[in-house]
Design a protein with these regions (language model features):
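Short, intrinsically disordered low-complexity segments
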Residues: 2, 18-19, 137
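Sec-dependent signal peptide recognition
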Residues: 2-9
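Short, linear, compositionally biased motifs with a strong N-terminal bias
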Residues: 10-11, 149
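Bacterial Sec-dependent N-terminal signal peptides
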Residues: 11-39
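First exposed extracellular module after export/assembly in secreted or surface-exposed proteins
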Residues: 28-156
Length: 156
């Protein structure tokens, strides 16, 4: 009986002492939006022309894996802020929008990327209201962490 009890307790000890190795690292870092490169566009205070295309170019990075990126262009005729702009560009007078430009667009990031450069053509309609606009960039990593960068731009 003692041998059985000893064998049972020894087996129980080894079974409970074996811990499943969980080397999975939990991602707690926000992804990064980089618009400082020479060819990045738009940048703070960039001017965009009505009726013309421009190329959105930025670099995104994450410590584990990027998920998605989206752009939101909307008017700033009321001088609101998203608290991400580093400086203002000198506002036009406050005005009521008649036909403002609004664009909300997702851009794909291939799976498994830690660094990605986006290059996307955006057409600005010719008949929109000129003035102050915000160009918001949102990048989300696979874990769900999101970084937002707001740029003040002018549409002429």
């Amino acid at each position: 009986m003692k041998k059985f009890l000893f064998s049972f307790l020894t087996a129980l000890f080894f079974l409970t002492a074996c811990k499943k190795s969980n080397d999975e690292v939990i991602d707690t870092e926000y992804p990064v939006i980089d618009v400082t490169a020479q060819d990045a566009f738009p940048k703070q205070c960039s001017v965009i022309k009505r009726g013309e295309k421009f190329v959105f170019h930025a670099q995104f990075s994450d410590n584990v894996q990027l998920g998605s990126v989206s752009v939101d262009i909307h008017h700033n005729f009321d001088h609101h802020s998203h608290s991400t702009e580093v400086s203002d560009c000198g506002f036009d007078p406050v005005k009521t929008p008649v036909k403002p430009f609004l664009l909300i667009q997702d851009y794909p990031i291939p799976a498994g990327q830690k660094v990605f450069q986006t290059t996307a053509e955006i057409m600005v309609p010719a008949d929109i209201d000129p003035g102050d606009y915000h160009f918001l960039i949102r990048v989300t990593d696979k874990e769900g962490w999101q970084t937002i960068k707001g740029l003040s731009i002018k549409v002429q």
